Amino acid sequence: MAYQRTILAQMLKEINRHDFKIKVSKYAGDHKTHKLSCFNLLTVMMYTHLKSSITLRGIVTGLGLMLSSFYHLNLKSIKRSTLSDALKQRDSRIYEEYYYSLLRNMNRTQRRKFGNKINIIDSTTISMCVEKFNWAHYKTTKAGIKLHTQIDGDTRIPEHVTITNAKVHDINGVNKTTQYRKGEIYVYDRGYACYKFLYTIELQEAFFITRLKSNWKTRVLTSHVLEGTKALFDDIIEVDGLKHGEYPNPLRLVTFYHEESGKILKFLTNNFEMPAETIAEIYKYRWQIELFFKWIKQHLKIVSFLSTSKNGVKIQIWCSLITYLLLNSIKSRLVKTLDLFDIYRRLTLALDKKIDILELLTHKIEATIPIQKPSDIGQMELFYA
């Protein structure tokens, strides 16, 4: 009978060990390390995120119960203090750089719904206890961090992530996050609507779509009434008043009626070629990033941290993103028709099971569990027990 690795071990085969070792060597990550190497820490953190463990005790206990199944991963008995020290001492840049390396090597052949690549940019704030995470203090009684994120709108995969203090403004965070490419479309909410910021995108021959702020002073150059569509007006405008110098070029303003809310929405863009309804539809795509934030918070538990150190928090976040990438890689290679949550659920329930991962993901799960009818003797024994 052929030897079969556990599901967790098969997931870890997606990790390029040689590439990971290069990152470890760069930052001397395993220097004077005897108990928990950088790779073993990644293994433990992947287990943590997949099992949604939120305490050191829960992780150590869970791994201890499965130790016989994980011996081939070179995981020995781990103490809480060992795991806590590792999160403080291993350099978080190892996991950050490996995330981008893994991202580059993923096969992401994707049909683009709108032709152009859609990049969605936003941030999410993760609140923390100010007494425990004083390095993340940003208000009198609050602490927290922000994840400034750019995702691919068609795959919902994060391509750039910057972790900052929660007090950092979204535009300052995105300037560290985003690399603009000619012809691609960048979608923002109104929090990023700033003349100077948008003009930097224009100068790099990329496109943006955002919402018009109500206090912006603009002047209509030409106006077109659109009939027979949900888009009401398609106007060419320019920035008026003292701010004109911050964005001297013409802009396009699409006025759209949103039936579900009954609201009139105004979309601002520098793309003059796409149909007005397509502009509105692309902006609707912005919800993909909200779904991504919800997914990683709900399923990979990045709202509860095992370490109070800044380094430990970053390690946990980057390991959760690596786990998210691996789940997407498995989906794209093995079971494109299966929902990402279904893949996650099956893998988490069988992490220590020695079964082929493809068999696990393609096996038909019965809706009902057959129950054997007990014999008369069994019923009598139960009655008199």
Regions found by a protein language model. Give the residues of each.
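Single, function-defining residue in the core of a domain
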Residues: 1-58, 62, 88-90, 97-98, ...
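Extended, structured, electrostatic nucleic-acid-contact surfaces
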Residues: 64-73
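Major-groove recognition helix of helix-turn-helix-like DNA-binding domains
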Residues: 72-90
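Short helix-terminating capping/connector loops at secondary-structure junctions
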Residues: 75, 112-113
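Short Lys/Arg-enriched helix C-cap and helix-to-coil transition segments
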Residues: 93-105
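A short, well-structured juxtamembrane/interface segment
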Residues: 103-110, 171
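Extracellular beta-strand-rich solenoid/capping regions of secreted or surface-exposed proteins
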Residues: 136-140
